């Protein structure tokens, strides 16, 4: 369904074209990821994220060099009950390979979760409608205090009436009125898939196995600290070589990885947040699919039309109005207006089409 948006022609920054769950993904989550990335980056490269216990012969810049090397290269965790350090092969398997890359991974996750938003904006342009402009100008009209007796407003409302040629295309004898709904479902499916992919990537990236957020949370609730579990260890070891007078000396330093204290809290919270987003996103998809039911369509539009002051509303008429004029695209567009404004703005959006429909019926 293609609706004439000439009445809502003033362009503003698009912010009113998504529902609450979309905004949780595309705005709040992106802000959470980017702000966390900047915080961790500042802690790593501006503050002191690692301190190593160096021997006495490390004088001058040696200790600083060792700490910089251990920060850039991987450190590894050894349980304090182990009296000896493991062999080289075992050390490599115990390396912590994530802490240097945390800021970049967070930035990457922010980009990934914003991809459906970019696609949604592109699809709106492709189908020829800007929902943000529709909703925003409805809000402006509501805030301006205009009444229905104002001839200018009546003129503008007539301009936005949904005519048959403007609301649908005929393809092989059938009206095409589900393009907007298809785009909505496609972006929501994509967003949900990307959330699960991001959770799987975090499980792999942290090297703590699947469902690491649940596992670490259970450990914390049971009083099992990082010294026992090895999750996000604060004390690690680092190996490096120093060439002195033609000899290569191997050193193993014990280091305090302070940034892991923040990483633990951040990635546990992030895992649970993504789990919540996954549940909400699945619910969101089923909510859109539920709008295909005739009962919901009639109930929803009847509630919207009740705000127009029309007392003569029958379920049969509303059903015909939905089938012939709004169809599923109109239903979903009205839902988006309602989600970003109020029921009264949604009623202002539907009223001209309803009045035109009743005139045609008579």
Curated annotation (Swiss-Prot):
TM spans (from-to): 27-47, 101-121, 189-209, 266-286
GO biological process: monoatomic ion transmembrane transport
Family matches, as InterPro entries: Innexin (IPR000990)
Membrane topology: Multi-pass membrane protein
GO CC list: gap junction; plasma membrane
Keywords, alphabetical: Cell junction, Cell membrane, Gap junction, Ion channel, Ion transport, Membrane, Transmembrane, Transmembrane helix, Transport
Pfam family name, one: Innexin
Recorded GO MF terms: gap junction channel activity; gap junction hemi-channel activity
Family affiliation: Belongs to the pannexin family.
Job description of the protein: Structural component of the gap junctions.
Protein name as it appears in the record: Innexin-17
Lineage: Eukaryota, Metazoa, Ecdysozoa, Nematoda, Chromadorea
Gene giving rise to this polypeptide: inx-17
């Amino acid at each position: 369904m293609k609706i004439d948006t000439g009445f809502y022609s003033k362009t503003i920054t698009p912010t009113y074209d998504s529902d609450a769950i979309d905004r949780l993904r595309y705005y709040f989550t992106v802000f959470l990821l980017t702000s966390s990335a900047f915080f961790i980056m500042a802690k790593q490269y501006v503050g002191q994220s690692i301190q190593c216990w160096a021997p006495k012969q490390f004088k001058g810049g040696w200790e600083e060099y060792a700490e910089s090397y251990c920060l850039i290269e991987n450190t590894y965790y050894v349980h304090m009950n182990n009296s000896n350090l493991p062999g080289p092969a075992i050390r490599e398997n115990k390396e912590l390979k994530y802490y240097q890359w945390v800021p970049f991974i967070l930035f990457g996750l922010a980009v990934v979760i914003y991809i459906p938003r970019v696609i949604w904006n592109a699809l709106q342009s492709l189908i020829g409608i800007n929902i943000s402009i529709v909703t925003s100008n409805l809000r402006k009209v509501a805030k301006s205090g205009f009444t229905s007796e104002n001839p200018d407003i009546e003129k503008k409302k007539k301009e936005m009436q949904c005519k048959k040629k403007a609301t649908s295309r005929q393809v092989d004898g059938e009206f095409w009125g589900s393009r907007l709904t298809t785009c909505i479902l496609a972006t929501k499916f994509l967003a949900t898939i990307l959330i699960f992919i991001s959770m799987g990537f975090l499980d792999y990236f942290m090297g703590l196995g699947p469902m690491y957020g649940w596992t670490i949370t259970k450990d914390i609730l049971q009083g099992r600290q990082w010294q026992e579990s090895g999750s996000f260890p604060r004390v690690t070891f680092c190996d490096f070589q120093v060439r002195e007078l033609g000899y290569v000396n191997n050193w193993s330093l014990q280091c305090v990885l302070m940034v892991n204290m923040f990483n633990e809290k951040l990635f546990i919270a992030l895992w649970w947040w993504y789990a919540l987003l996954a549940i909400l996103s699945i619910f969101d998809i089923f909510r859109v699919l539920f709008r295909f039911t005739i009962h919901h369509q009639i109930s929803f539009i009847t509630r919207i039309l009740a705000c127009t002051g029309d007392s003569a509303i029958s379920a049969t008429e509303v059903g015909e109005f939905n089938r012939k004029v709004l169809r599923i695209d109109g239903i979903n567009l009205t839902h988006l207006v309602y989600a970003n404004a109020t029921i009264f703005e949604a009623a202002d959006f539907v009223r001209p089409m309803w009045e035109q429909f009743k005139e045609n019926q008579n």
